[in-house]
Amino acid sequence: CLQILKKGQKSMARNDGIDRTLARNQDLETPDDVTKVQEHNEREKDRYSNVDIVPERTALNVHFKSPTDDYVKMFEQMEQDKIISTRGLKPDAVKYGELVFDVNSAYFYNHGGYEFAKQFYADAYKAAVEIVGGEQYILSAVMHADERNRGNVGSSGVRMCTTITSCGLYPGGGETNPVVEAMQG
């Protein structure tokens, strides 16, 4: 859950007493992109270029849905089992998506800390399952509690976010992510 600010964009953690949430839908265009996201989300690397990951805190991460295999193989199995179909899609259609919910740490620490964060993201996960039409369309959902939040002065500096990685194909057709549509709705 690395927050990369665009030029002129302010950090969520501004220490101004206002709680902020960032929901970002990221298209994953190639299987290589999916593999990189999996390595990050599932903490499969021995070393990270992201210096904000604190390996000693990785045990605090919470899976709301653990992957049963690597993400690309899971997607392929879903196709074989006819849970999803890619028939008729344009060759350049995006098949995978990642939805990141990021909330400034102070919000959690002011409302009950780690346990509150776990419940918050459990509820977000339940909503995502309902919106996409079932848990079978979600490959993995994990709350990261092992990343520093350098911009959050006055808190413990731990950033908590959850990432929901899904196949980009949902019941009823279409290539848009209904989670994001519902949030924007």
What is the meaning of each model-derived region?
Residues C1-G185:
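N-terminal nicking endonuclease/strand-transfer module with a His-rich metal-binding environment
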